[in-house]
């Protein structure tokens, strides 16, 4: 499919979609599943074959029925009304914007978002996403295939501070942290505590402690949340742009509108609603079980 024309109207619709995403995520407490949708759409990228990536293909049944994507049809359906109100936006952009907003609304860092991803109808083969039952070698195989680094692996794993696992989707059950709708560095703090009653630690989580290269980032992020936020924002941006080359030229307002003015506005709103999101989160988790 052709790349979208990112003109003034496209940017207006991105801004509108951002506002609607804030409202949806705040009212439904669905930040975890929106982050998971963004991750799983982008995380299929293969740097060698230049296939997969953040291209919106996860909206097709062929892909959302992959075992690793169980439950994500919920997020896809929740986003359809927003897509209808901002029809120029590609699904690829919408899904990545949803992940960015999910992090910010729950108190996490601002992740730079540049629009222009093209949609694809070509679904990658199953098996490109991480298997939670495996270890460090598997994590490197998956993330290096995307073109990402050890630091990216650990920083992005910190996204497990949001949400919980459900047995019908992953075979595992439980949240990683005490406040699964608050984005902070508690994932790493809990990881260093060892086994905690009621909290989840996947084999891939434990691998971060056992591998020396991974472990140094775990220790760093546990003691320095600011550094975690900085590194996470950089790694999330890289993930969200897999298979996409942001515009390097064109209207000066394209990048500045989204990376400066809009960021200031979204940050202010995000701080205001973060507390409310945490309060309502457990009610939503109980009723919807959205990861």
Swiss-Prot record:
Residues annotated as site: Transition state stabilizer: 36
Binding site residues for heme b: 160
Presence of keyword Chloroplast: no
Cofactor(s) named in the record: heme b
Main location: membrane
Binding site for K(+): 161, 177, 184
EC annotation from Swiss-Prot or TrEMBL: 1.11.1.11
Residues the record marks as active site: 40
Topology in membrane: Single-pass membrane protein
Recorded catalytic activity of this chain's protein: L-ascorbate + H2O2 = L-dehydroascorbate + 2 H2O
Leader peptide range in chain numbering: none
Compartments, as annotated in UniProt: Peroxisome membrane
Keyword Calcium part of the UniProt annotation: yes
MF terms (GO), sorted A to Z: heme binding; L-ascorbate peroxidase activity; metal ion binding; peroxidase activity
Keywords recorded for this protein, A-Z: Calcium, Heme, Hydrogen peroxide, Iron, Membrane, Metal-binding, Oxidoreductase, Peroxidase, Peroxisome, Potassium, Transmembrane, Transmembrane helix
Cofactor note: Binds 1 heme b (iron(II)-protoporphyrin IX) group.
Tissue expression summary: Expressed in leaves, stems and flowers.
Highest taxon, organism lineage: Eukaryota
Triggers of expression: Down-regulated by hydrogen peroxide in leaves.
Function of the molecule: Plays a key role in hydrogen peroxide removal.
Misc. comment: Binds one cation per subunit; probably K(+), but might also be Ca(2+).
Name of the protein this chain belongs to: Probable L-ascorbate peroxidase 4, peroxisomal
Name of the gene: APX4
